[in-house]
């Protein structure tokens, strides 16, 4: 049976078109920088993007709230809440055309795990593309208040005796993260291992969706967890636990979430992919301004986004950290970064580290061709084209796809030109 498509003009259609035009005009006035539909316009006006209720999803939320997708010719973009990173993966596997999603606010390693079929049903590869990094820093490693007397902060070894005692009593020690092989998994593993605690032998790692972390610690389901904000802040505000360290203390200026898309969507809609990216980049610039933090906290706190009190978002967003163990730091540089200093640009060297760490913990084979994989997934070339069309100053566009050597809190150095040497320098690992 043929599908009949009618194109009659309705009053509702006229009103919708007029409303969209008015929105675009208003947004152009509020955000005068950048080009609108430079060259050929977007092939489509819609895309379905997923997000998890984490502060680093702010660029997608702000792009939607401020009409930036519409400004760049895509007024029908939908930003849809996902229940977990597993749900994000499953909906990306489906794709937008099958009632899933086309792209997402995503853990930076997850596109690689999907691209290679490591975390998909029947290990079926789902080609993925990284278009941008969404943020740096401001995740947290938090601990149940029963461990407050250990004085644990950056040095996780202070937990070793307490963990050993608990296990001797026949109890399980649980470390929670949000997705195997994701950023939170890698941060908590790095922190534990640096303190001499083997995350595969000395504790049990469990997966808990970000919005469920606080409730699960409240009922004693885990001893320590790693998650993004606002959940560490909420944990402290509710008096359930304390933050031992923020991830910026482990690796200052570390990459965190990415804007990931299905590769087939990007290939089919290259102009739309660039338009989406330009909207997100403008939103990142807005998010990065300290004067916008209170408004951003209020936006994110809305029911349709995070449904949390704005105060659970605001403090750490501004670099004010109440660790919950008597330690309070104000005006720190550990706040979440969204733009300045090349944050949005997806450095290939950063993806190289994520892959090296997942080799360390057995997610990828030691002989994985890291460079080939990064070149397949990381489309920093699209970011450069979008930046040019957006009018980003040449000085703000990184000259190289490598940020060079990275140094961690325990003195370890990662050279992206020699991941094997880095892996050889590590004591606790699965990879041999």
Identify the role of each PLM range.
Residues 352-432:
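Conserved C-terminal helix/tail region of periplasmic/extracytoplasmic solute-binding proteins
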Residues 56, 65, 88, 184-187, ...:
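Stable alpha-helical elements in mature extracytoplasmic
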Residues 1-13, 20-28, 36:
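N-terminal secretory signal peptides
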Residues 101-102, 201-243, 262, 294, ...:
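Ligand-binding pocket segment of bilobal, Venus flytrap-like solute-binding proteins
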Residues 38-207, 219-233, 240-253, 415-421:
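Short, glycine-/small- and polar/acidic-enriched structural segments
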Residues 141-142, 258-261, 265-266:
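Short glycine- and hydrophobic/aromatic-rich loop-to-beta-strand nucleating segment
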Residues 269-381:
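Secondary-structure end/capping motifs
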């Amino acid at each position: 049976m043929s599908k009949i498509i009618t194109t009659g003009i309705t009053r509702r259609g006229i009103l919708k078109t007029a409303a969209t035009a008015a929105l675009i005009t208003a947004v152009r006035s509020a955000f005068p920088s950048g080009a609108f539909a430079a060259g050929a316009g977007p092939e489509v006006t819609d895309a379905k993007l997923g997000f998890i209720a984490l502060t680093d999803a702010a660029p997608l939320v702000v792009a939607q709230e401020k009409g930036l997708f519409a400004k760049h010719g895509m007024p029908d973009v939908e930003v849809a809440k996902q229940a977990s990173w597993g749900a994000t993966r499953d909906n990306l596997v489906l794709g937008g055309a099958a009632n899933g999603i086309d792209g997402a606010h995503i853990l930076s390693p997850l596109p690689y795990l999907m691209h290679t079929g490591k975390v998909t049903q029947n290990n079926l590869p789902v080609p993925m593309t990284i278009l941008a990094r969404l943020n740096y820093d401001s995740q947290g490693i938090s601990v149940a208040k029963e461990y407050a007397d250990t004085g644990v902060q950056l040095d996780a070894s202070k937990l070793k005796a307490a963990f050993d005692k608990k296990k001797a009593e026949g109890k399980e020690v649980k470390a929670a993260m949000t997705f195997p092989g994701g950023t939170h998994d890698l941060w908590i593993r790095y922190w534990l291992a640096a303190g001499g605690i083997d995350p595969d032998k000395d504790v049990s790692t469990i997966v808990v969706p970000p919005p469920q972390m606080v409730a699960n610690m409240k009922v004693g389901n885990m001893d320590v967890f790693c998650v993004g904000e606002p959940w560490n802040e909420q944990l402290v505000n509710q008096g359930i636990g304390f933050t031992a360290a923020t991830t910026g203390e482990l690796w200052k200026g570390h990459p965190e979430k990415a804007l990931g898309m299905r590769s087939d969507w990007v290939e089919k809609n290259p102009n739309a992919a660039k338009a989406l990216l330009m909207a997100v980049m403008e939103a990142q610039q807005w998010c990065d301004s300290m004067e916008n933090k209170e408004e951003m906290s209020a936006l994110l706190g809305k029911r349709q986004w995070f449904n949390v009190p704005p105060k659970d978002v605001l403090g750490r967003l501004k670099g004010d950290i109440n660790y919950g163990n008597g330690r309070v730091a104000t005006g720190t540089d550990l706040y979440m970064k969204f733009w300045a200093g090349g944050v949005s640009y997806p450095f290939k060297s950063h993806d190289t580290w994520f892959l090296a760490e997942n080799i360390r913990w057995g997610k990828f084979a030691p002989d994985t061709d890291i460079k080939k994989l990064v070149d397949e997934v990381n489309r920093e070339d699209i970011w450069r084209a979008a930046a040019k069309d957006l009018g980003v100053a040449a000085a703000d566009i990184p000259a190289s796809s490598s940020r060079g050597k990275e140094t961690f809190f325990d003195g370890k150095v990662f050279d992206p030109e020699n991941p094997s040497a880095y892996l050889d320098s590590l004591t606790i690992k699965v990879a041999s």
